[in-house]
């Protein structure tokens, strides 16, 4: 319809990169990292759907901040359906929480059905990225906006990518 043949269209589409933190992928050591920005219950539920679709052995990283750019009210995490990750037929996953409101996220996961003792709490970005670098297989990071910024910068640096703004 646009006068573009299918082969050209496919070649062009192969070069499209995902947007800043929106299903953005990184290879870090043996970890296949996907970053999925979350900002509200509806978007978080879609990220949970994606996370639940990943194969066994996935590592889930939840990074929750409450800075102005995130919105200072994080009560929305109670409206997201984290329970779907812990239904009896679901495969177990490694859980990590980080960010300014990591303790709130840990509590939310506990009430969703996660074993609280199995949830790792990591405060520093460097420590978190070091931990992710030691993972094998799929790692899915679900950060809020201000949590994503330093994580993405460190991942980009370690993976030899340019800063998003450059």
Label each region the model flagged:
Residues 2-7, 11-166:
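ATP-dependent carboxylate-amine ligase
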């Amino acid at each position: 319809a646009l006068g573009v043949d299918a082969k050209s269209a496919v070649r062009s589409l192969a070069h499209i990169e995902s947007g800043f933190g929106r299903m953005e992928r990184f290879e870090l050591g043996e970890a296949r990292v996907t970053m999925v920005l979350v900002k509200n219950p509806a978007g978080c539920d879609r990220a949970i759907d994606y996370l639940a679709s990943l194969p066994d052995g996935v590592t889930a990283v939840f990074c929750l901040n409450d800075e102005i750019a995130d919105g200072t009210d994080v009560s929305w995490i109670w409206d997201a359906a984290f329970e779907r990750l812990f239904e009896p037929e679901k495969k177990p996953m490694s859980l990590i929480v980080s960010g300014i409101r990591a303790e709130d996220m840990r509590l939310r996961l506990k009430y969703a059905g996660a074993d609280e003792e199995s949830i790792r709490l990591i405060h520093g970005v460097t420590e978190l990225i070091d931990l992710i670098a030691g993972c094998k297989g799929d790692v899915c990071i679900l950060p809020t906006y201000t949590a994503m910024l330093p994580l993405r910068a460190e991942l980009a640096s370690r993976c030899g990518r340019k800063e998003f703004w450059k």
